[in-house]
């Protein structure tokens, strides 16, 4: 896991085309010492890395991003205010692994993305 102890998987389920995970963020992780001191924010690139790591774990293979069709960071993800995040991933395999993913907690959506991986 690239992100070491930044998060842990609390719950993980999948079907042939979907992954649902609940993760617990570690607000004491060193990444938040610089982003930002006293007011931690989970960087958008880190949120996308978590999606990639969940996919790799479930599919049992390494992935590399090919294209990102859309990506929106809708709300700030402060790990102290929102220690758990539900991540939903829908995917189809064609020439590339096409995914639609979003992260939410208690009805609040934090990010949405459409990505193709190889």
Predicted regions and their residues:
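Short amphipathic alpha-helical face segments that pack within enzyme cores
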Residues: 45-53
